[in-house]
Structure formats: structure tokens, C-alpha cells
């Protein structure tokens, strides 16, 4: 037991570079070839951005996934029908592309970015309530190519959107 404690203390001291003597080799340490670097940049992160009309978008590899925010789905109530565009539809930023109908109201959908629709969430035809149950995951609406990825910079971050929602609730 004491030998194990000594090895642990020595390993900690070496990892903190406190040891006076040279550190013994660590067989559990990854080799230089096995170490992977993690880069973080706006092109690599899939961050959710929001519009003032309560749509959200995440972008990865030039494809944007679009849906409505939790605030919007709560305001709508139980979604019973989704009217979505066809694949191949070209959209401009803030252009109307469909509508959601609920037991309380109907709400138009607006494209957060410019691009072309590449996929429509077919599951919503059978189960439009996915928008309520999982608005950020299974309840997404469309996927689209981004014709101008710089438009993402004009949208609100999650924190800014939360502040925006609080300001309109007051």
C-alpha cells in the first residue's frame, strides 16, 4: 500500500512539475502521435443562434438546421400541423417558408438565413407534436445549405436571446 502511495505522490509531483529529480517514464501517458488537438472556432462549433421571430439555427459544414425556440412552442401550444417547404426551395433571410398550426393559433415561419432547403423533417407530418416535445432535437423543421454563412453573425446568441425573451415578457 505504501509503495502505491509513493508512486501516486511522485506522479502528481511530476505532473505538476514540482519534483526536483527527473520524472520516471509514465507508461500510461499517450505518445505524441496519439495526442489529438482540439480546435475551437466559429466554423467548428455548432452553436445555436436565434432570431427575433423565435427561430433557431445551428450550422455544421455549411448546413443549417432550423427550428423554433422553446419560448415559441410554449406560446403556440400543442402543434397539430406543420406546413413546410419542399426540398430545393431557395430562401432568403427572413423570408416566410411555412407555418405551424396549433390548437391556440397559427404562426408563420421565417428563414433565419439565406440558402436552399436540403431536407424537411418528415417525422413532423405524422407527429407534429415533436415540435413541442423536443423543439431543439427531434422537432427541427428544415435543413438548408447556407449561401452566406456570415449571416450567422447577425443572429442572437443563446444568452442574448434569453435577455430578449425576458424583455418582451415584461
UniProtKB/Swiss-Prot annotation:
Cofactor (UniProt): (R)-lipoate
Mitochondrion as a keyword of this entry, yes or no, is: yes
Set out the biological process GO terms recorded for this chain's protein. Answer: glycine decarboxylation via glycine cleavage system
Q: Which residues carry this modification: N6-lipoyllysine?
A: 104
Q: Cofactor binding mode, per the note?
A: Binds 1 lipoyl cofactor covalently.
Q: Which Pfam families match?
A: GCV_H
What's the domain of life for this entry? Eukaryota
Residues covered by the Lipoyl-binding domain: 63-145
Localization per record: Mitochondrion
Show the GO cellular component annotation of the record.
Answer: glycine cleavage complex; mitochondrion
Keyword Mitochondrion (UniProt): yes
Q: Which InterPro entries match?
A: 2-oxoA_DH_lipoyl-BS, Biotin_lipoyl, GCV_H, GCV_H/Fam206, GCV_H_sub, Single_hybrid_motif
The entry's keywords: Lipoyl, Mitochondrion, Transit peptide
Could you point out where the transit peptide sits in the sequence? 1-45
Q: What is its main location?
A: mitochondrion
Offer an example of a GO molecular function term for this protein.
Answer: enzyme binding
Xref: Gene3D superfamilies:
2.40.50.100
Role, per record = The glycine cleavage system catalyzes the degradation of glycine. The H protein (GCSH) shuttles the methylamine group of glycine from the P protein (GLDC) to the T protein (GCST). Has a pivotal role in the lipoylation of enzymes involved in cellular energetics such as the mitochondrial dihydrolipoyllysine-residue acetyltransferase component of pyruvate dehydrogenase complex (DLAT), and the mitochondrial dihydrolipoyllysine-residue succinyltransferase component of 2-oxoglutarate dehydrogenase complex (DLST).
Of which family is this protein a member? Belongs to the GcvH family.
Q: How does it assemble?
A: The glycine cleavage system is composed of four proteins: P (GLDC), T (GCST), L (DLD) and H (GCSH). Interacts with GLDC.
Q: Which NCBIfam families match?
A: gcvH, PRK01202.1
Annotated protein name in UniProt: Glycine cleavage system H protein, mitochondrial
The species this protein belongs to is Rattus norvegicus
The gene that this protein is the product of is Gcsh
Amino acid at each position: 500500500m505504501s509503495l502505491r502511495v509513493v508512486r501516486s505522490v511522485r506522479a502528481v509531483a511530476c505532473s505538476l512539475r514540482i519534483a526536483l529529480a527527473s520524472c520516471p517514464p509514465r507508461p500510461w501517458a499517450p505518445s505524441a502521435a496519439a495526442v489529438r488537438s482540439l480546435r475551437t472556432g466559429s466554423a467548428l462549433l455548432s452553436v445555436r443562434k436565434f432570431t427575433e421571430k423565435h427561430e433557431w439555427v445551428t450550422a455544421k459544414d455549411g448546413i443549417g438546421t432550423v427550428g423554433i425556440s422553446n419560448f415559441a412552442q410554449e406560446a403556440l401550444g400543442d402543434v397539430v400541423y406543420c406546413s413546410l417547404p419542399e426540398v430545393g426551395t431557395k430562401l432568403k433571410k427572413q423570408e416566410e417558408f411555412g407555418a405551424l398550426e396549433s390548437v391556440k393559433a397559427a404562426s408563420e415561419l421565417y428563414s433565419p438565413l439565406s440558402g436552399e432547403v436540403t431536407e424537411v423533417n418528415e417525422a413532423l407530418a405524422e407527429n407534429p407534436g415533436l415540435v413541442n416535445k423536443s423543439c431543439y432535437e427531434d422537432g427541427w423543421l428544415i435543413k438548408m445549405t447556407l449561401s452566406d454563412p456570415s449571416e450567422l453573425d447577425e443572429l442572437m446568441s443563446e444568452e442574448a436571446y434569453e435577455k430578449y425573451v425576458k424583455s418582451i415578457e415584461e
